[in-house]
From Swiss-Prot:
Role according to the record: Involved in the regulation of the intracellular balance of NAD and NADP, and is a key enzyme in the biosynthesis of NADP. Catalyzes specifically the phosphorylation on 2'-hydroxyl of the adenosine moiety of NAD to yield NADP.
Protein name as catalogued: NAD kinase
GO MF entries: ATP binding; metal ion binding; NAD binding; NAD+ kinase activity
UniProt-listed HAMAP family: NAD_kinase
Enzyme Commission no: 2.7.1.23
Keywords: ATP-binding, Cytoplasm, Kinase, NAD, NADP, Nucleotide-binding, Transferase
Subcellular location: Cytoplasm
Gene: nadK
Family note: Belongs to the NAD kinase family.
Domain of life: Bacteria
Catalytic activity: NAD(+) + ATP = ADP + NADP(+) + H(+)
Length: 270
């Protein structure tokens, strides 16, 4: 018996995902799982990594009591352990799933402070980025209390270890195992010449350190929190930290990290 385990399903708009979600819903209902979108124990994403990220942000303020499981219906699913052909295996895994054995990945806490004193706080699973809405971005970068550099360029990306395989990798960042509790800063098209100078390489920042970016407050900026994009003015500072918040994945046939990396980017090695 599943003892009325509460689940909720979130899918993307593709026809394949819709069909998979409907089929899985029927199987779960037949097995007497309880569907609860307010206080689910397990959120099942059906689609790809973007769907999983959307699901995480929908339950961003319940992460201490929600676990996630991914079913991918496309070509690449870094956060997903099952395919659309594994639906009965999904049900078996949900029966066997033990909350005490959940897999936890760290999230980055992003605190945005504005010149009028207003603040917003978000958490990201992959990365947060800051860019100028137009022209070159200029901003001081502090590591904890130390003024490290004055950055000039298109922008900055700050990623988690699991997010190191996403946008961070595409701009030359390193791939970092989730057991390494750290953040990574990667530059987006920095200016480096005889007048302006940045480090010019990705940086791994330790767990207890904070990263603070102080951009010119009069400019317009585009901030992303994973797949979410917002436009802001009058930003005083943006602080990035590992505050202990994690996302929990149901430990159901969970694929080891390096196996995920190999399958996602390299394929079969002969």
């Amino acid at each position: 018996m599943n003892f009325g385990k509460k689940v909720w399903l979130i899918g993307n708009s593709s026809e394949k995902s819709k069909k998979t979600l409907n089929k899985l819903s029927k199987i779960l209902k037949a097995e007497h799982f309880v569907f609860d979108d307010i206080n689910p124990e397990i959120v099942i994403s059906v689609g790809g990594d973007g769907t999983l990220l959307r699901a995480m942000h929908m339950y961003e303020y319940q992460l201490d009591r929600v676990r996630f499981l991914g079913v991918h219906t496309g070509h690449l699913g870094f956060y997903t352990d099952f395919t659309d052909e594994d639906l009965f295996e999904v049900v078996e895994a949900l029966y066997d799933e033990n909350p005490a054995q959940a897999i936890h990945y760290p999230l980055i806490c992003v605190q945005v402070s504005f010149t009028d004193g207003y603040q917003i706080v978000r958490h990201v699973l992959n990365e947060a980025t800051i860019r100028r809405a137009s022209k070159t971005m200029v901003g001081d970068v502090r590591i904890s209390d130390y003024l490290f550099e004055r950055f000039r360029g298109d922008g900055l990306s700050i990623s988690t270890p699991t997010g190191s395989t996403a946008y961070n990798k595409s701009i030359g960042g390193a791939v970092v195992h989730p057991r390494v509790k750290a953040m990574q800063i990667a530059e987006i098209a920095s200016l480096n010449n005889v007048v302006y100078r940045t480090l010019g390489s990705p940086m791994i920042v330790a767990e207890k350190d904070t990263i603070t970016v102080c951009p010119a407050p009069e400019d317009d900026y585009s901030l992303t929190f994973d797949q979410l994009t917002f436009e802001y003015k009058n930003i005083k500072s943006i602080e990035f930290s590992l505050d202990g918040t994690t996302i929990s994945f149901a430990n159901c046939a969970h694929t080891p990290f390096w196996e995920r990396v190999s399958k996602s980017f390299i394929g079969e090695v002969e």
